């Protein structure tokens, strides 16, 4: 009975709609809790220190979720990236061109907009990086919920885009927030990564090898002064993707199947619970539209991501640098670009890393939350509308199969 319940639960957690919904519920609980009469208890909880004395680790619960649990999320992201690079959409240079170009546009444009608008504001020396990332789980969850009538190539494009986007964000985290690196600990982390790679080559399958290697890699990077979530990405990229003839599943697919429900159902929601608790009042809402940092984050996400992803994609297609995904019109791609403005998880992480002042962090988080909500609502509305268009076209084809394909204007080269 317990096994069956656990099996059903993990099956549900693997669906993008459920994962996105749990993430949203966790963020809503945090917001309601911190803005309730019991808000002080929320703050006390997040600031509670949990120490592992022999290892000299003293982190608050909020830091454990940020540095520890998100490493699991980034491990899954690393597995997804490796799969896409080796056997997925990014393995074919022709198909990979568009999501890669779109991801670059979706990182550079928000950063430029944020840097210009927030120039001179406290924290903007690194705060320009806050709006550069797309939340994979949230964006795919919204697409699964509202874009069921959109061609399947939409999910492939958005997933590939978000994976490359997250890779670029991870590189920024490594470059911007690595200070005072300890070479000895960095070498220790590299040795553990080499051990993981060697175990993969030797076809070792026991968790008694991989779990200690993962934990020591995380600890070594933490002690080295490198953000420890990068351990997850590195180990994910070092995991074998192609199965042997005697294997039903490759190690990467097996690990993703096992760990993705834990990431979606526990790790990311707990991070959201501890990170999304932002006091919202009239003062905060007023500052959102007057403070340069808040405006930089909001416009960087909502305008920068949308313009960057869609604009650079349109240019690449028009000039023959990439091809448009089969079945998708420019209006479909615009709707997907709006979903790219859902920053959430990684944007909240970067806000905590980039901004030293508590009040500034809370304001930036509020900007991320408000903008991510706006992007999800706007993207949902656009996807629902596009879904009706695709459904109407399909119905027309079924009723009049001999009259040809009544094409949608957005499917051609026009933006109409």
UniProtKB/Swiss-Prot annotation:
Segments of this protein annotated with the region Disordered: 396-416
UniProt keyword Cell membrane, yes or no: yes
Gene Ontology biological process terms, A to Z: regulation of pH
Domain of life: Bacteria
GO cellular component: plasma membrane
InterPro entries in the record: Na/H_antiporter_dom_sf (IPR023171), NhaA (IPR004670)
Keyword vocabulary terms for this entry: Antiport, Cell membrane, Ion transport, Membrane, Sodium, Sodium transport, Transmembrane, Transmembrane helix, Transport
Main location: membrane
Function: Na(+)/H(+) antiporter that extrudes sodium in exchange for external protons.
The protein's name: Na(+)/H(+) antiporter NhaA
Native species: Nocardia farcinica (strain IFM 10152)
């Amino acid at each position: 009975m317990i096994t069956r319940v656990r099996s059903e639960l993990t099956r549900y957690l693997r669906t993008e709609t459920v994962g996105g919904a749990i993430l949203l519920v966790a963020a809503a609980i945090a917001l309601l809790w911190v803005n309730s009469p019991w808000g002080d208890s929320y703050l006390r909880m997040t600031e509670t220190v949990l120490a592992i004395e022999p290892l000299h680790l003293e982190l608050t619960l909020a830091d454990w979720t940020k540095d520890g649990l998100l490493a699991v999320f980034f491990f899954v992201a690393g597995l997804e990236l490796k799969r896409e690079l080796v056997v997925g959409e990014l393995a074919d240079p022709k198909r990979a061109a568009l999501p890669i170009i779109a991801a670059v546009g979706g990182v550079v444009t928000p950063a430029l907009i944020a840097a210009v608008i927030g120039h001179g504001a406290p924290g903007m020396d690194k705060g320009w990086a806050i709006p550069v990332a797309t939340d994979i789980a949230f964006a795919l969850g919204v697409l699964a919920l509202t874009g069921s009538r959109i061609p399947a190539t939409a999910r492939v494009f958005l997933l590939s885009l978000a994976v490359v986007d997250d890779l670029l964000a991870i590189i920024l985290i490594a470059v911007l927030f690595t200070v005072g690196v300890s070479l000895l600990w960095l070498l220790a982390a590299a040795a553990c990564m080499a051990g993981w790679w060697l175990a993969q080559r030797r076809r070792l399958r026991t968790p008694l090898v991989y779990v200690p290697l993962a934990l020591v890699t995380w600890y070594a990077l933490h002690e080295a002064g490198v953000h420890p979530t990068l351990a997850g990405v590195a180990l994910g990229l070092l995991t074998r993707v192609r199965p042997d003839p005697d294997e039903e599943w490759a190690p990467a697919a097996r690990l993703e199947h096992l760990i993705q429900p834990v990431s979606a159902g526990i790790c990311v929601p707990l991070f959201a619970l501890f990170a999304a608790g932002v006091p919202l009042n009239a003062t905060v809402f007023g500052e959102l539209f007057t403070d340069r940092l808040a405006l930089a984050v909001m416009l960087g996400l909502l305008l920068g991501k949308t313009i960057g992803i869609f604009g650079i994609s349109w240019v690449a297609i028009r000039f023959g640098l990439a091809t448009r995904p089969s079945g998708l019109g420019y209006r479909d791609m615009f709707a997907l670009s709006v979903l790219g403005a859902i920053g959430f998880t990684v944007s909240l992480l970067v806000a905590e890393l980039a901004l030293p002042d508590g009040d500034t962090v809370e304001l930036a988080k509020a900007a991320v939350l408000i903008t991510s909500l706006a992007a999800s609502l706007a993207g949902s509305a656009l996807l629902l509308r596009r879904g009706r268009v695709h459904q109407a076209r399909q119905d027309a084809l079924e009723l009049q199969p001999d009259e040809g394909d009544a094409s949608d204007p957005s499917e051609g080269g026009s933006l109409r």
